[in-house]
């Protein structure tokens, strides 16, 4: 069950990343990890697909906005981006349990207009069910 949850979280993160075009000045480490972590926790907790949709919308609204400047200046805060993303994903599930709601289509809003220049939902679901992204070789 843990491995399945991990794979589902990775799949969501990867697919959101594929569908997004981050702004040039935005460091994307952590963006897609927040909903990925949230989905992994939700899957591990046996939430329904409808619950996960709500959790994705909450967690996407919590995705960190990071710039590239710390990388260029050598600031070590950049090392916390991915970990903070995981923490916020876990927090999103607890917030859902406490009754918080997100906007209807947070990925399109957050990744398509705030952290990015475009979000293409069709790319997020292209080939869904054919092969898991974790099985695909890198570039």
Model-found features: residue ranges?
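A glycine-rich phosphate/pyrophosphate-binding beta-strand-loop-alpha-helix module
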Residues: 1-38
